[in-house]
Amino acid sequence: MEVPEPSSPTEEEEEEEEHSAEPRPRTRSNPEGAEDRAVGAQASVGSRSEGEGEAASADDGSPNTSGAGPKSWQVPPPAPEVQIRTPRVNCPEKVIICLDLSEEMSLPKLESFNGSKTNALNVSQKMIEMFVRTKHKIDKSHEFALVVVNDDTAWLSGLTSDPRELCSCLYDLETASCSTFNLEGLFSLIQQKTELPVTENVQTIPPPYVVRTILVYSRPPCQPQFSLTEPMKKMFQCPYFFFDVVYIHNGTEEKEEEMSWKDMFAFMGSLDTKGTSYKYEVALAGPALELHNCMAKLLAHPLQRPCQSHASYSLLEEEDEATEVEATV
């Protein structure tokens, strides 16, 4: 009596098993399951990956500004996005830290690590010092400058590679009531004090340095004094200039207010036509830990970090929504 042999799997069944295999979880070494995707056209070595020139959203999603107040904001006309690939190198940075000294920075609303209330100015001073000293340990050729902003702007500390020089000007600062925010004056001062590098080939030749402005800002929503001049257009379109923002807002939306903090946050984001800058918003009545975490995320080199909407700070995808328990700097 013949015993029938077990039938071998057909080619169609093998293909179904291959397609049914679950992809690997998304990790730092395998972002978005990159190794499980079909091999496509690869970007050239040392260039930004596909999609990193897209407009960045603010920390896992920018606020929805569809319900703006009755008064329209004078937002700069939308310029075409400049998608330029640059070498992903750790060249020296010239970091200009702009600290707001409005009276909102002195309100004791932030919750400190021990549960007591503190103000945004004290927290900002500490996180700026930690940022400068950590960046200096990463690369001692980085340079830093401190600018304070109230009704006007003042350049307190020139570009220096010694963190002690900047930190000596960082404390003993006083806040004041501010009626306006002269954003145009701030950028004009930056243009006077710095010079943007120029290379023969942006895609292949690393720049000698990059210029990055970090604005720590906390004011009620108000239309800044700003007009986009031709020199400013060139500055924002330069692939070696970055404008990062940490916006500390009141977190409330009263009906009688014509403008919302979301309008101001969207205005700041509209200045970045390249999609390479990072923008964060933190509630003034929230934990001080959030401010430290935002500043820690800005430690990455702007030429080496991804578009903000692609940035992930967890090992696995399931941890994306987990609450961070400590600031890492």
From Swiss-Prot:
Regions of compositional bias (Acidic residues) in chain numbering: 10-19
Name recorded for this polypeptide: BRISC and BRCA1-A complex member 1
Superkingdom as given in the UniProt entry: Eukaryota
Species this protein is from: Pongo abelii (Sumatran orangutan)
Keywords: Acetylation, Cell cycle, Cell division, Chromatin regulator, Cytoplasm, DNA damage, DNA repair, Mitosis, Nucleus, Phosphoprotein, Ubl conjugation pathway
Written domain comment of the UniProt record: The VWFA-like region is similar to the VWFA domain. Its presence reveals similarities between the structure of the 19S proteasome and the BRCA1-A complexes.
Phosphothreonine: modified positions: 65
Any single GO BP term: double-strand break repair
Keyword Iron among record annotations: no
Record-listed N-acetylmethionine modification sites: 1
Lineage of origin: Eukaryota, Metazoa, Chordata, Craniata, Vertebrata
Subunit (UniProt): Component of the ARISC complex, at least composed of UIMC1/RAP80, ABRAXAS1, BRCC3/BRCC36, BABAM2 and BABAM1/NBA1. Component of the BRCA1-A complex, at least composed of BRCA1, BARD1, UIMC1/RAP80, ABRAXAS1, BRCC3/BRCC36, BABAM2 and BABAM1/NBA1. In the BRCA1-A complex, interacts directly with ABRAXAS1 and BABAM2. Component of the BRISC complex, at least composed of ABRAXAS2, BRCC3/BRCC36, BABAM2 and BABAM1/NBA1. Identified in a complex with SHMT2 and the other subunits of the BRISC complex.
Family: Belongs to the BABAM1 family.
Residues with the Phosphoserine modification: 8, 29, 49, 57, 62, 66
Region (Disordered): 1-84
Region (VWFA-like): 95-298
Subcellular localization(s) per the UniProt record: Cytoplasm; Nucleus
GO CC field: BRCA1-A complex; BRISC complex; cytoplasm; cytosol; nuclear body; nucleus
GO MF annotations, alphabetized: identical protein binding
Function comment: Component of the BRCA1-A complex, a complex that specifically recognizes 'Lys-63'-linked ubiquitinated histones H2A and H2AX at DNA lesions sites, leading to target the BRCA1-BARD1 heterodimer to sites of DNA damage at double-strand breaks (DSBs). The BRCA1-A complex also possesses deubiquitinase activity that specifically removes 'Lys-63'-linked ubiquitin on histones H2A and H2AX. In the BRCA1-A complex, it is required for the complex integrity and its localization at DSBs.
